[in-house]
């Protein structure tokens, strides 16, 4: 699905008029075009399904890395910074830090690809809970591992700048699949690494 930049421009122009401003005045002349270009960039992830993202970043290694010697060995990354936009208010979700873990099953994914997946999934109209679920689903497809965990901490503009207006409020969500959900030893190890 392609983003319709021209339609966005027209609608932003209409919003400016609805707000009581003049889209022809000096400061706003190019605003509809700039906003449309920005939306094309920040919502790039909406152009791709989870299957397409999995295909795009499916760069794995199947070396003999002794990854099968201990079935609870895990790959863990944290502090992956992303942003997204709340689908309810189009408000920015910011200061988002993603932690991702998986237990390899015969193949591993390049580390930069994990960060790219998180970034691409964030570039959609989203819920924080769904970001975690989407990342987990994509990693499961690429690695063939059921054992995936995603922890996300972030701030939501819809909570911090409007409505209740509570700046600094952080939301933490977890998506735990496979052993991360069923094996206390694995989940404890995850939490130890996350809080370290």
Curated annotation (Swiss-Prot):
It is an enzyme of class 3 (hydrolase). Pathway: Cofactor biosynthesis; 7,8-dihydroneopterin triphosphate biosynthesis; 7,8-dihydroneopterin triphosphate from GTP: step 1/1. SUPFAM superfamilies: Tetrahydrobiopterin biosynthesis enzymes-like (SSF55620). GO terms for cellular component: cytoplasm. Its EC number is 3.5.4.16. GO terms for biological process: one-carbon metabolic process; tetrahydrobiopterin biosynthetic process; tetrahydrofolate biosynthetic process. Zn(2+) binds at residues 86, 89, 158. The keyword Transmembrane does not apply. It catalyses: GTP + H2O = 7,8-dihydroneopterin 3'-triphosphate + formate + H(+). One of its GO terms (molecular function) is GTP cyclohydrolase I activity. Keywords: GTP-binding, Hydrolase, Metal-binding, Nucleotide-binding, One-carbon metabolism, Zinc. HAMAP family: FolE. PANTHER family: GTP CYCLOHYDROLASE 1 (PTHR11109:SF7), GTP CYCLOHYDROLASE I (PTHR11109). Belongs to the GTP cyclohydrolase I family. Toroid-shaped homodecamer, composed of two pentamers of five dimers. This is GTP cyclohydrolase 1. The gene is folE.
